[in-house]
Amino acid sequence: YVHTNEEARDYKVLRCKTNQIDKLEVFIPAKKETVIGGFEFLDDYILRSEKSDAIPKLFVRNIKTNKEEEIKISDEPIGVPGVSLMQRDTNTTMIRVGWESMATPGQVYEYDIVSKQKKLVKQTEVPSGHDSANYVVERIKAKSHDGQMIPISLVRLKTAKQDGKSKILLYAYGAYKHSISPSFSASRFCLIDRGITFAIAHVRGGGDLGDRHHEKGKKKFKKNTFLDYIACAKHLIEQRYTYKGGICFYGGSAGGLTGGAVANMAPDLFFGMLLLVPFVDTMTTMLNEKLPLTPGEWEMWGNPIKSKEYFEYILSYAPYNNPVSYTHLTLPTIAEV
């Protein structure tokens, strides 16, 4: 079995008989906006992962019948599954599957592939106490400026009303093909328990929907990242999860660049910006080739030293070069020295 991205930007799986590498055939084909992940083997089954529509999934395939099914551990719409083959014996139908979501801390189940029976064997404890049943996890989509649908993952109190009166902490990153998993973080719940919704905008530039999702959010397409985020913010307002001026941006480093850019482009949507070591002086950094990290960063942002086009493009969005009035915004930042 061969896991490859040759002529398949988001990978595919090929197979051949032993010593017949020249006779490879497609086993798992490439799929649009789906990242085909790795796989594990039992004697009679193949376990594999993929991320489709920014949602991680696990599948099991019977080698003899070639029938494949998704392993569903939870009724929650989105989460982060994982498989671990703890035992040396591969002649088994019993595996261990991990699960967590934005509402549920990490769990480990024993799962029987044939019977589909599961048994909880480990539950991550939250010292302050936590009941996942008190919360709801949702997945919605916003239409960006060019028609691209951008996923939004969110978690909130089950008792929270969708009446356009709640505040939202809306996270984004959008760079380096880095995917943001809809995973659990106990620290968020001090806000969620106060009625604030936590959401993730899976904007372009990251890798949530595969390589094309990344490519359309870098270099000359970088503004797609910011426009995607603004589209997500407006959609949350339209769907009455929040209201205009009820959103706080949250992000760091390259995500801080996203925050700085959207603060300049649509300041009226936000009441605050939580920026962690934000990359807001983009132009000055990209012009200084003596900085050790700058040459490697040109692959993400473009080289403004050699290209007038990139110089003008970066200058048009770099937060430090495009300030507006922030009198109504709270702008805490955290910087490393």
Task: State where each predicted segment sits.
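Beta-strand C-termini and the immediately following turn/loop, strongest in propeller blades
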Residues: 1-7, 45-54, 96-102
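Structural motif
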Residues: 8-14, 54-59, 104-109
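Structured, non-catalytic alpha/beta "coupling" segments that mediate domain-domain communication
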Residues: 10, 94-117
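Multi-bladed beta-propeller domains
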Residues: 17-40, 64-85, 114-134
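Cap/lid segment of the alpha/beta-hydrolase catalytic domain
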Residues: 124-239, 243-245, 252
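Active-site-proximal cap/loop segments of hydrolase catalytic domains
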Residues: 200-329
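Single conserved hydrophobic/aromatic residue that forms the stacking wall/gate
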Residues: 328-337
